[in-house]
Each structure stands twice: as C-alpha cells, then as structure tokens.
A protein has these predicted regions:
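Short beta-strand/loop motif that positions the catalytic acidic residue
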Residues: 107, 112-115, 119, 127
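Catalytic histidine-centered segment of alpha/beta-hydrolase-like enzymes
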Residues: 144-159
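Gly/Ala-rich beta-loop-alpha elbow adjacent to hydrolase catalytic centers
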Residues: 69-82
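Conserved loop-alpha-helix segment in the C-terminal half of the alpha/beta-hydrolase fold
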Residues: 123-136
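Acidic catalytic loop of the alpha/beta-hydrolase fold
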Residues: 117-122, 146-147
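A conserved short beta-strand
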Residues: 88-101, 110
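Serine-hydrolase catalytic machinery in alpha/beta-hydrolase-like enzymes
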Residues: 1-65
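Active-site nucleophile loop of the alpha/beta-hydrolase fold
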Residues: 1, 29, 95-103, 116-118
Length: 171
C-alpha cells in the first residue's frame, strides 16, 4: 500500500512490491493545505485531513484477509501510514521515505527509513536520533534532498539503484 501525495516519486518501489505479490492500493488525501512548512497549525490540519481521507478510503479493507501488509510511504505519508497502523493495531512492514520527525511518535517495529542529509523538511540529527530510539534501520543519503536526489543525474541514478536494492531485500 502506498501512502503519499504523488505516486510518481515511488513508482519503482511500488513496482517492486507488486512484483513480490503485494496488492497495491494508492491512498489519496484529496486537497491539503499549502505552504505548511514551518507552520505547525497548518501541518496538523494537513495531517488531520489526510488521515480522515485515509480512514474513508480504507474503511472496507479486511486487513485480516492479508498474510502480509506492506506500507510504502513518503513525507507526510510516513506519519499517516504510521498513525493508521497504530489506530487499527495492524502489524505491518513499512518503508519510510523521507520521514518527518512526527512519524517517530508511533510504533515503527518492522520499518526501515531513507533520509537525505540535505532534506529541508527534516533535520538529519533529529531523524537519526529518533530512528535509533525506535530501532528503525535508517539509510542516509549524503547531500540528498526530500526526494533523495542531489541534482547530479549520475549520482542520483546510483542512489536510486542502491535504494532499490535495499528496498528489494527488505520486501
């Protein structure tokens, strides 16, 4: 299951999960507030709206009919997927791409995370500390932004390959 605002960022990761036999559900959040960075009230509003849409979208899913549940999420989606799993007492495997600090306020057993050290949305030191506290394996990508990209195409291709290999091993 993919939690994010734009599935184009994780198309290859979703394809890996599909190839491993996972059914894919792309959770859509509808319209969220803009310009939320640095505005705690807007961030909380975005979270509440996204979680509400997620609850509605997934209300008829029979989680007990699945042998294994994998959540793939990015950015705000990491908070939403973690909150949803917690609310519904689900045992899931989670791949957290560019998680925000609030993601780590939930149980994250069975998760791995990927973070770029130049991510303007989450400070590396904070993410490292929180991941260590929750015992979440964290893969850092040096000089990468919130999309795990550096701006150098060849470097980004190498990053993508390394990331995909790690994701495939995890799945």
């Amino acid at each position: 299951m993919y939690f994010g605002t734009d599935d184009s960022h994780l198309h290859k990761e979703i394809s890996l999960a599909r190839n491993q036999g996972y059914q894919i559900l792309n959770v859509s959040y509808g319209s969220l507030p803009e310009n939320v960075k640095g505005d705690r009230a807007k961030m909380e509003q975005a979270f509440e709206l996204a979680l509400k849409h997620t609850e509605q979208f997934l209300q008829n899913v029979d989680w007990h009919s699945y042998g294994s549940i994998l959540f793939i999420s990015k950015s705000i989606g990491t908070i939403i997927s973690s909150a949803y799993a917690s609310r519904h007492d689900l045992t899931v495997k989670s791949i957290l791409f560019t998680p925000l600090a609030d993601t780590f306020s939930f149980s994250l057993a069975g998760s791995i995370a990927f973070h770029g050290t130049a991510d303007p949305w989450a400070e590396t030191e904070i993410i490292q500390k929180l991941a260590q506290q929750k015992e979440v394996p964290l893969f850092l990508t040096k000089n990468a932004n919130h999309s795990l990209e550096t701006g150098d195409v060849l470097t980004d291709i190498t990053i993508l390959k390394t990331t995909m290999e790690r994701v495939e091993r995890f799945i």
